[in-house]
Amino acid sequence: MNRLTKKLKELKAENKKALVAYLVAGDPDIESTLSLMKLFIESGVDIIEIGVPFTDPIAEGPIIQKAHDRALQKNVSLSLIFNMIKDFRIEDNETPIVLMGYLNTFISHKDLIKNNEENSIDSILVVDIPGEVNLADYGLESSNVNTISLISPTTKENRIKSIAQNSSGFVYYVTLRGVTGSSNLNIDEISKNIEKIKKYASVPTLAGFGIKSPEDAKLLAKCSDGVIIGSSIVKMIEESSDSREFDRIGQYITEIKQAISWID
């Protein structure tokens, strides 16, 4: 069974919420990314989401855009990312890994996705195509890689149905109107929209974008199957890029994990 599917089933059976942590591969360098992935697991992360650097990351806010720029300056490619993941798999063959990126990158390296040597990755999220589009149409299908689609607060119900049914990993509900890293969570709207998604989805619905504090995470975990933390982690990585001291990130993740583990 695909690692992501297995992990989400286990969490559901244990009545637990999933914690997904995001970082951009190669920011500040590929060695630090590998170290951070290990730190994520030690701090309680269930699933790792790796951003694939791209020249025009239109779905991202300024914090993550800058991380893409820094990684590109280090010539980080999808091939290099796969090699890094293979190194990670030497020590950890259990943690699900999701690649989040843009269509042109994945098409340019479609053999990496299709072959997925040693089952390195578990899912891909292509952010710049409609969620109801089948990745097989782009030659990106793989028997052991499932797909994740985005649904936003402005997505109409007829599209919610088709997008939810097209997702084989989980549905990624974007909690905010705009790009990643925005603020001000409308919990009532989020709760209603996730309820709507769950009518159609056979896979879990996780919430992301705009989660800054353990309190934010706890609120979202009450109405979703898990939370995705991105911009706040990427910001801390940037602030620690000179020293390469990432302990503060581990502490932050631990606090998020504790918050979503105690849902009233």
Question: Which residues fall in each region the model found?
Answer:
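Conserved N-terminal beta1-alpha1 strand-loop-helix module at the mouth
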Residues: M1-E94, Q165, D247-T254
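Short, well-ordered coil/turn segments that N-cap beta-strands
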Residues: E14-L19, G44-D46, D92-I97, S120-D122, ...
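Hydrophobic faces of well-ordered beta-strands that scaffold small-molecule active sites
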Residues: L19-L23, I48-I50, I97-G101, I124-V126, ...
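Catalytic cores of alpha/beta
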Residues: I30-I41, T155-N166, A207, I211-V227
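Glycine-rich phosphate-binding active-site loops on the catalytic face of alpha/beta enzymes
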Residues: V45-D56, D122-N134, V171-G181, C223-D242
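Histidine/lysine/aspartate-rich catalytic loop segments that bind and position anionic ligands
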Residues: N144-G181
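Alpha/beta catalytic cores of nucleotide-metabolism and tRNA/nucleoside-modifying enzymes
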Residues: E195-V203, K212-K218, K222-D264
